[in-house]
Amino acid sequence: MRIQVKGRSGFSVDAELLARVEKKLGKVGRQVSPLAELEIELREERNPAIRDGQVAEATLHLKGVTLRACKRAPDMGHAINLVADDLSRQVKKHRDKRRARREAHRVAQERAA
């Protein structure tokens, strides 16, 4: 899986954040095809009235489907963890749906034959 990390609105991505993204989203990479592409955007909301000012947005491009997750947290590391968990849940749900459809189709063909 190819991972592309971007910093938006003047947010700079340092080596520590890059390593954290690789580690946490690598778990998602084991669940999907090696051809999948993941784009993650990290940014900081500058409004002091917003408590959860650190934002992580992830877009996972798979064959035939695009999964998105956007999470906010007071700390960027926590926002990355939340996005990774959400994407992992979405990938599992998508995989289970595909498996159920494939199995239902196979059973229908066996009954018809």
Where are these regions (language model features)?
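N-terminal, polar/charged subdomain of small-to-medium soluble alpha/beta proteins
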Residues: 1-113
